[in-house]
């Protein structure tokens, strides 16, 4: 697992033939943020921002996960999605 593999996966996920399910997208989003930013560093969105709260909660669940572990999980998930949805 390398930065180049991670960058390639981040590009490939944009070209899937079908949009992944919301839960799959939350996994991709949260692991990307953990790998690139680290632990969450923002306040939880307001009560009516349902999408923002879901994304924040997914990222917050990864607090303490290393950059390397987040990158590996992200790459593995993108590979799974490529097989499921095509590219």
UniProtKB/Swiss-Prot annotation:
Residues carrying N-acetylserine: 2
Modification Phosphotyrosine, positions: 29
Binding-site residues for an acyl-CoA, renumbered to this chain: 14, 29-33, 51, 55, 74
InterPro entries referenced in this protein's UniProt entry, alphabetically: Acyl-CoA-binding_prot_CS, Acyl-CoA-binding_protein, Acyl-CoA-binding_sf, FERM/acyl-CoA-bd_prot_sf
Main location: endoplasmic reticulum
Modification N6-acetyllysine occurs at: 8, 19, 51, 55, 77
Role noted for this protein: Binds medium- and long-chain acyl-CoA esters with very high affinity and may function as an intracellular carrier of acyl-CoA esters. It is also able to displace diazepam from the benzodiazepine (BZD) recognition site located on the GABA type A receptor. It is therefore possible that this protein also acts as a neuropeptide to modulate the action of the GABA receptor.
Locations listed in the record: Endoplasmic reticulum; Golgi apparatus
Family statement: Belongs to the ACBP family.
Gene Ontology cellular component list: endoplasmic reticulum; Golgi apparatus
Protein name: Acyl-CoA-binding protein
Domain ACB, residue spans: 2-87
GO molecular function: fatty-acyl-CoA binding
Keyword terms: Acetylation, Endoplasmic reticulum, Golgi apparatus, Hydroxylation, Lipid-binding, Phosphoprotein, Transport
Gene: DBI
Modified residues (N6-(2-hydroxyisobutyryl)lysine): 55
Modified residues (N6-succinyllysine): 8, 17, 55, 77
GO biological process, one term: fatty acid metabolic process
CDD domains noted in UniProt: ACBP (cd00435)
Modified residues (N6-malonyllysine): 55
Subunit structure: Monomer.
């Amino acid at each position: 697992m390398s930065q180049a593999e991670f960058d390639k996966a981040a590009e490939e996920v944009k070209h899937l033939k079908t949009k992944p399910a919301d839960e799959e997208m939350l996994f991709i989003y949260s692991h990307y943020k953990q790998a690139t930013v680290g632990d969450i560093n923002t306040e939880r969105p307001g009560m009516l921002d349902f999408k923002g709260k879901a994304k924040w909660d997914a990222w917050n669940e990864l607090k303490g996960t290393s950059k390397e572990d987040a990158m590996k999980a992200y790459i593995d998930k993108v590979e799974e999605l490529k097989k499921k949805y095509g590219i």
